């Protein structure tokens, strides 16, 4: 066990990691595709939407590390303590969406891998290769490898994205968009706004992933961080992910806005168009800047998602099996890692032209589940199991009330829009 009487700075390094992995999970399609498209179509008009979405979800994701540090157990264990209804609600939503989500982020990563390497393979073969790489990393290196690789990727991603934005600002070929942009208050505009804010910066159920990563980090280092240290880690990751979302919006605004192109296309098509227009606007020398930024954004998401779902499902299975005398062997993390990834590849292979519909369905389920998980996390934190010094401050409680009202209204608006204009 690491000693806890060391200086705050020396012990903080042991707490850092889970929040960065959460950020890596967040910085994927929502950033590379949705944020960049927001800038491409509306200039800087939708910065407020990113900030508002991030603010409204903040309390419910912050409750993840707060609960885990205060109790020493994951929020999934907390859901079970609230009642089996909470745990099985989470499990049901996860099972309905996990393979489609993993398949969606993997195929976008696959298209970028083809551009990065110049090796022309089918999207399915590249997707298989990407997932095999992720599985190998996680099976051999486990959480320790995930922690180290994500920290490296986050550095590369942050540097490459910052350079890409600075180059776009400084280029004579990239003009700052005029203040007047197309109205967002149209059928198509509101539909896009819902998609942008719904995934920004990450879904609330990711608080369960974060909780499990904290427990793994404690096992890895032998150090149990103080609440303040764990919240610093969370804030670095969460706020950093929100800042990078604005950076990708700036890329779209500076490079793609006013190009006259149609950006209402799939994620793989959008990333190809982004790279093409970025290069044609700034010059061929800028190709590697945008490709590296895009690939690291998507690979980090694919790697973290490939870890998150098996870790979550295996934990839930073993949590329930703890009631029996002999937990089954197939409930192990490695088994789930292979099974879930294989099923995601099956989804990719069989879906074909129906894949976009499946992604849309998963998106709908995720949006409608957001207020449910916000309520569960709120109830978990204010259930009376907390000691006074771990209870959230009043401002966070008030923010959670606002967030719950906003997220619920947002889900109702999303459902209304789907039923009225689909």
Q: Language-model features: where?
A:
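Extracellular/periplasmic helix-exit of transmembrane alpha-helices
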Residues: 58-68, 214-215, 221, 239-272
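Hydrophobic alpha-helical segments and their helix-loop junctions in multi-pass secondary transporters
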Residues: 155-183, 193-212, 374-386, 410-422
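Flexible loop linkers connecting adjacent transmembrane helices
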Residues: 2, 35-39, 61-85, 113, ...
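Juxtamembrane transmembrane-helix boundary signature
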Residues: 22, 49-80, 89-101
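Loop-to-transmembrane helix boundary motifs in multi-pass membrane proteins
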Residues: 123-130, 236, 240, 317-350
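Membrane-water interface regions at transmembrane-helix termini and the short interhelical loops
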Residues: 108-116, 131-153, 347-357
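Membrane-interface loop-to-helix entry segments
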Residues: 138-169, 184-187, 360-370, 396, ...
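Hydrophobic transmembrane alpha-helices that form the core helical bundles
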Residues: 87-118, 127, 298-317, 354-355, ...
């Amino acid at each position: 066990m690491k000693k806890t009487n060391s200086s705050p700075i020396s012990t903080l390094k042991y707490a850092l990691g889970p929040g960065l992995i959460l950020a890596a999970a967040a910085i994927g399609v929502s950033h590379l595709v949705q944020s960049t498209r927001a800038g491409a179509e509306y200039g800087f008009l939708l910065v407020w939407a990113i900030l508002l979405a991030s603010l409204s979800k903040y309390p419910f994701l912050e409750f993840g590390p707060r609960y885990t540090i205060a109790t020493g157990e994951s929020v999934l264990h907390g859901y079970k303590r609230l009642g089996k209804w909470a745990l099985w609600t989470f499990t049901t939503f996860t099972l309905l969406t996990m393979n489609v989500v993993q398949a969606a982020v993997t195929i976008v990563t696959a298209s970028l891998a083809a551009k990065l390497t110049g090796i022309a393979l089918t999207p399915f073969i590249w997707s298989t290769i990407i997932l095999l790489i992720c599985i190998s990393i996680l099976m051999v290196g486990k959480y320790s490898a995930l922690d180290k690789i994500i920290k490296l990727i986050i550095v590369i991603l942050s540097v490459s994205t910052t350079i890409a934005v600075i180059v776009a600002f400084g280029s004579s070929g990239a003009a700052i968009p005029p203040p007047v942009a197309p109205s967002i208050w149209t059928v198509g505009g509101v539909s896009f706004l819902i998609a942008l804010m719904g995934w920004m910066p990450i879904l609330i159920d990711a608080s369960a992933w974060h909780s499990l990563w904290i427990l793994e980090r404690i096992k890895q280092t032998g150090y149990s961080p103080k609440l303040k240290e764990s919240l610093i880690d969370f804030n670095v990751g969460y706020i950093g992910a929100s800042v990078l979302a604005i950076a990708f919006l700036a890329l779209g605004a500076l490079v793609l806005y006013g190009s006259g192109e149609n950006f209402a296309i799939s994620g793989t098509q959008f990333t190809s168009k982004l790279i093409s227009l970025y290069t044609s606007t700034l010059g061929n020398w800028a190709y590697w800047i945008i490709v590296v930024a895009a690939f690291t954004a998507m690979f980090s998401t694919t790697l973290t998602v490939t870890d998150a779902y098996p870790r979550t499902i295996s934990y839930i299975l073993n949590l329930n099996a703890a009631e029996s005398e002999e937990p089954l062997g197939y409930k192990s993390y490695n088994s789930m890692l292979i099974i879930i990834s294989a099923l995601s590849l099956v989804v990719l292979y069989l879906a074909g032209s129906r894949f976009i519909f499946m992604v849309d369905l998963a998106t709908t389920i995720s949006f409608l589940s957001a207020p449910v998980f916000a309520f569960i996390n709120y109830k978990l934190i204010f259930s009376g199991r907390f000691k006074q010094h771990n209870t959230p401050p009043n401002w966070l409680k008030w923010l959670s009330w606002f967030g719950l009202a906003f997220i619920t209204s947002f889900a109702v608006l999303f459902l209304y829009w789907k039923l009225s204009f689909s």
